[in-house]
Amino acid sequence: MEPPIEPRQDAKELTAHAFSLSSSPELASSIVCGGCGTVIDASEPYPFRCPRSGDDGDHVLRRVLDVSRLAFPLEVSEPNPFVRWRGLFHSYHLATAHGMSDQAYVDLVRDLDSEVARVDGHGFVVTPFTAAPALADPLETRASIWVKDETGNVAGSHKARHMFGLLVHLEVVRLLGMTDGPIPPLAIASCGNAALAAAVVAAAGRRRLLVFVPTDAEAKVLDRLRVLGAEITVCPREAGVAGDPTYHRLQAAIADGALPFTCQGNENGLAIEGGETLGYEMAAALAGQGRLDHVVIQVGGGALASAVAQGLSESAALGVLPGMPRVHTVQTAGAWPLARAFELVAGRLPAKPGPEEVHAAIRYAAAHRSEFMWPWETVPHSLAHGILDDETYDWVAVVEAMLMTGGQPLVVNEGEIAQANGIGVEATGIEVDPTGSAGLAGLAQLCRRGLIGPDEHAAVLFTGARR
């Protein structure tokens, strides 16, 4: 086993600048509101939403690590990312602080993973992150292109990572006796991959799941959800009511006592943690042998981009990477609320802003959400239907990551989405869907604009399998 890499001071400063939050002195992890700075008490069993939410602030909770007390494990013999990187999870620090042994926590994760395998055919393993030289010619670049392939993950996408991290936390607080009464149902609003992932993981945990879907949800997705035992509610749009109707129904269910089992950080900030394993895996693959200059991430609700950015930032702070790559995001021409918000925040900054100026603009934006983020005004349509969220719920963290790293929000049209999907499938042999390859459309745009150097390394994530 290789020794863990110790943190470097400059990398720790990078994380402090990028996320501007403090950690709890009791645990090596804490849950902090990115909007108002409220630190959630460690005794709270469901640290999902800020208690001060309800005003115009963007009260999305973030899990924050005290990297001075942690190390990044580089052992390659452990295939399960939730075991390998357990020391970076809030649920682990909560469990061990209350007397659960390391082995007991590992056994819990392995037992839950075995249940996932029972339901879906296989459990969680580190997914491939490799160079894809066959992409260079179609993109007309000499840069090194890397692909993180999530199409073979549980339920066919990255979404199950978010859900499994939540399930582990829920089982920890149950075993520790931090809750009483009946186990509340779980709830999610989704049109596809997120719902399927939630249903698989909920079934593995033997928990009731409420799923709110749009009227155009695919029949084969609904059939699979029913097989998995999910309780489905179809949600039509209501005349004169802005926003996603499935999200409105989700909020109503949460108000009635359901627990948010979602990828949206605004409803459950702890959902981001499981997705951070993507960033850890990418960093571990590059440790000691490579660098990453750009990462291009497709965005719907924003949980994927938020998780990858934070996972890479923590990896840099722990000395695995020499620094953060530029974080770029991709949305469709059908709906681009994140790009709109980015431009509004950037409009408050000078041409070459320093970290403190970025932090000030982000603090203002987080306190005045309605000035920067609101539902898309028209009903969006795209081949990449999985990223057509009316709002980017985790927008503040993602805008901050782009501003701090020099990344850009990209908007791609339907032709670019279709072409990128064709290129991605042909060049890599990966059966990725148009949503899952939308990041490649953004990378192609950056290459055409001459923004990817010939000696640079850029990564995309193929996040959803063709069904």
Annotated model-derived regions:
Residues 160-166, 187-205, 218-222, 272, ...:
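Short glycine/serine/threonine-rich phosphate/pyrophosphate-binding segments
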Residues 23, 29-111:
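N-terminal juxtadomain amphipathic helix
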Residues 237-263, 314-431:
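Active-site/ligand-binding loops adjacent to catalytic centers
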Residues 91-179:
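Positively charged, low-complexity intrinsically disordered leader regions
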Residues 182-185, 194-240, 244-253, 339-343:
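Active-site-proximal loop->helix
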Residues 176-201, 205-214, 291-301, 327, ...:
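A short, small-residue-rich loop immediately preceding and capping a beta-strand
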Residues 249-318, 419-422:
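Active-site/ligand-binding-proximal alpha/beta "capping" segment
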Residues 440-467:
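Catalytic phosphate/nucleotide-handling subdomain of diverse soluble enzymes
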